Amino acid sequence: MKHAPPLGFEQVPPGGMCVCAYLFVTRRDQLLLGKYADDPQWEALAGLEPERRRTHGWGWTVPATHLKLGEDPREAARRIGEEILRIPGLRYSDPRSEVDFYPSKMAPGEKHYDIWFFVDGAPPKDYELQVPPWYTELSWQDPRTLPAPTYARGHEDVVARWLATKSNVVGSGTKAAAR
């Protein structure tokens, strides 16, 4: 298939589908990125099974989660901020959606579809970075200069798309205008 799916999915596409929220926490033009620890809590926190966290723990990733069935992307972003990153007082933008599809690794000849919800987050000015035990590292990085090969899970593509479409966070509950 070389085109997007027809309107109105009635079942998951044969090549698979992911619906994810990404939380882009920024401070002074730097983005908070993490490296996964091989911690079983990832399954409950973000739907990240052992094979994926072991395979991708070497590189930088944007804090993210698969949405739970029926979960609002805004709630998923808050779950990332509060449960995964543990940042109190984080301010969130409204989500922006992006779609991607590419050859499926699990089903040769089929396409895998991704629906991404991008949410920007601004921590309180007095926030000091603390690394939860399910990360080996959390760090402020400049997404414009970080080399693509240092990202894991294809997150260099996610960050590139975010940079092309990002908005400014102006406060909790305030709709941010996308460019």
Regions found by a protein language model. Give the residues of each.
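Acidic, metal-coordinating catalytic segment for phosphate/diphosphate chemistry
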Residues: M1-F24, R28, Y36-Q41
